[in-house]
Amino acid sequence: MRDILFAAADIWMIAVGLICGVKVIRGQHNYLIGLEWIIMGVSGSNFLVYGVTKAGPDSLTHHIAFFLDAFSRSIGFTLILVLGLLVVTHRYKPTLRVEVGAFSLAAVLGFVLSEFADEIGTPGKVFFLITALATSGFLSYFAWRLREIGERAHAVWLLGATALNVVVASIYDFWRIPGDDADHTRFYILALFTWGLAMLVIYRAYAAFAAHDKRVGAGPDPVTPAPGIEIA
């Protein structure tokens, strides 16, 4: 039963990541969120193969799984996500240089934090937790903004998904779920379901916010854009 639930949770995350990733690129032209969602979908696909084949720690799928996990936990589902949401919350559009730089930084940190995890030790785990909590803070702000524009249902769903994400991030490297097996199957069932839910909820909330901006004819704020950022 655990294996079935694990596969179902993973397939759920894969489907949400790939489908919503493509939709946010095609419909919203937001490559930051879209590509990160697709990367998480690919990560889930690789993790499914890794789990089904029972590949060992020396396998290619193992190294890819740890790299993509570190990629998203360090910069992808944190800084890149926040930059993508700023497009609707603050009407900014990151330049190509910012987009390429963000993904490049995520790739570098993903490699370092996955390949040298044992050498880095606890500081790396704390870094992942801090980035997750900081991102959750911004998502809470995003939920408040949604409430302010009348999208209360989206705000509630976002707060719920964010709360689950905080739980996952808090126990990821620091606490073992009672009764879990050596492969942490129960944890990954919870984590994969949570990440899929978070991506779906954020995608729908983003689309609702973008639609609101379009309805009210929101134009650029009369402020000076940050370095490397141009007004949409």
Task: Identify the meaning behind each predicted range.
Residues A15-I25, Y50-H63, F67-F103:
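Internal transmembrane alpha-helix with an interfacial aromatic "cap," most often the third helix
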Residues G34-P57:
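A generic, lipid-embedded transmembrane alpha helix
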Residues G51-L60, V112-G121, S170-D181:
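Juxtamembrane "helix-exit" motif on the non-cytosolic side of transmembrane helices
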